[in-house]
A protein has these predicted regions:
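Short amphipathic N-terminal alpha-helix
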Residues: 105-115
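N-terminal leader regions
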Residues: 1-42
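Short, charged, low-complexity loops and linkers
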Residues: 2-6, 75-80
Length: 171
């Protein structure tokens, strides 16, 4: 698959430690001094936006301990967003869908081992789900990846079925 479609793990790897450090430092600051007026939050948001190039409004630096942890939040902030790829192919779409449906492979690389699942999971914010939402806007739905009753049987759609639905009206 072309590099412009693949998640940019190398960029994420380069930014990850600095972003994680900012998140944990903010937590320590809040534990010691509080941040009732949100002034420190806004400062950290600005620093993270500068590091990542992302709109930080979709991330919560306050509640990471109730969500998936500081490490996952740091990765999500560090990973560059998917882009619109107007000349995507059906084969590339099939590769994406197959990755999303496949078990997570094992990696010798600790960074990939820890975070690869975050790009393939079919949920809001996951890289490939967001790529599909962006590039197949007319046909994408998270429900394509959920179990459903089909002809009286509870099952998931196959990769081919999902590809045909998504490709049907190219986004």
């Amino acid at each position: 698959m072309r590099a412009q479609i693949e998640p940019d793990f190398e960029s994420a790897r380069k930014k990850y430690d600095e972003i994680l450090e900012q998140i944990l430092a903010y937590t320590d600051y809040c534990d010691e001094f509080g941040d009732e007026d949100g002034e420190e939050y806004r400062k950290v948001e600005q620093r993270l936006a500068k590091i990542s190039g992302k709109d930080m409004s979709k991330f919560s630096l306050h509640e990471w301990w109730e969500a998936e942890g500081a490490e996952n939040l740091a990765f999500d902030i560090a990973l560059p967003e998917p882009k619109v790829v107007p000349d995507r192919t059906k084969d590339e779409l099939r590769q994406i869908v197959e990755r999303m449906l496949a078990p997570v492979p094992e990696f010798d690389d600790d960074f990939l081992e820890a975070f690869y699942v975050r790009v393939t999971f079919a949920c809001k914010g996951a890289y490939f789900a967001e790529f599909l939402k962006l590039n197949f806007a007319q046909t994408f739905s998270f429900e394509l990846f959920e179990r459903r009753e089909i002809e009286g049987v509870m099952r998931e759609l196959s990769a081919n079925e999902i590809v045909e639905i998504l490709w049907g009206k190219r986004g």
